[in-house]
Amino acid sequence: MTRYFCCGNYFPGYPCYGTNFHGTYRATPLNCVVPLGSPLNHGCGTMYSSRNFCYGGISNFSNPGCCYGSSLYRPWGSGSGFGYSTY
């Protein structure tokens, strides 16, 4: 399985809290949709999280704009998340 990183440096390379494509809260690396070496890693280092949340309640506190739905960094355009498979 491809390793994915989450938003921020809090738990790099480890499971983080976020929403999957179904909108449910999970603590699993499957929520992280941007792999290492991705050209989209600008904006907040190499850490991205899925959808609109990082670590659940902490949100973008540490790295504003590095999550899906952000108004600051959204290099993927729509930010829907689809197009970067978590499976």
UniProtKB/Swiss-Prot annotation:
A Gene Ontology term for the protein's cellular component: intermediate filament
Record's protein name: Keratin-associated protein 7-1
Keywords recorded for this protein, A-Z: Keratin, Repeat
Described function: In the hair cortex, hair keratin intermediate filaments are embedded in an interfilamentous matrix, consisting of hair keratin-associated proteins (KRTAP), which are essential for the formation of a rigid and resistant hair shaft through their extensive disulfide bond cross-linking with abundant cysteine residues of hair keratins. The matrix proteins include the high-sulfur and high-glycine-tyrosine keratins.
Family: Belongs to the KRTAP type 7 family.
8 X 2 AA repeats of G-[YCGS]: annotated span: 37-84
Pfam families: KRTAP7
Subunit composition and interactions: Interacts with hair keratins.
InterPro entries from the UniProt entry: KRTAP7
